[in-house]
Amino acid sequence: MITKAAKNATRKKRHARVRAKLTGTAERPRLNVYRSNQHIYAQVIDDVNGVTLVSASTLDKDLALNGTSNTEAATKVGESVAKRAVEKGVKEVVFDRGGYLYHGRVKALAEAAREAGLQF
């Protein structure tokens, strides 16, 4: 009998492997991405102090995402999190894709964050 592991379980294993080697500091925090079926979330995290410096998601009221596609929404979230991070004085981050493939919504968010001023 063929048993196939659930996609989310394999993603969590992949994320745990990467997180063992990847940490964010105050000088270079971690840009974490979480993707659900309907929304996408991004946080800039200082792992040394255990503090979220900046966050943005498709649930934010100020983004006005009515009627946009998922990749367009991810692009706006990437721009928003980058602008907020630059305002807080963060210019360089470590990108943590959360175990997701660098494709689609995750890629759109990352490229928008780069264009808005974050370096990674």
Curated annotation (Swiss-Prot):
Chain residue ranges for the region called Disordered: 1-24
Entry's Gene Ontology BP terms: translation
GO cellular component, one term: cytosolic large ribosomal subunit
One Pfam family it belongs to: Ribosomal_L18p
Annotated CDD domains: Ribosomal_L18_L5e
Keywords of the record: Ribonucleoprotein, Ribosomal protein, RNA-binding, rRNA-binding
Keyword Ribonucleoprotein listed: yes
GO MF assignments: 5S rRNA binding; structural constituent of ribosome
Biased composition (Basic residues): 9-20
InterPro entries linked to this entry: Ribosomal_uL18_bac-type (IPR004389), Ribosomal_uL18_bac/euk (IPR005484)
Subunit note: Part of the 50S ribosomal subunit; part of the 5S rRNA/L5/L18/L25 subcomplex. Contacts the 5S and 23S rRNAs.
Family to which the UniProt record says this protein belongs: Belongs to the universal ribosomal protein uL18 family.
Role: This is one of the proteins that bind and probably mediate the attachment of the 5S RNA into the large ribosomal subunit, where it forms part of the central protuberance.
UniProt protein name: Large ribosomal subunit protein uL18
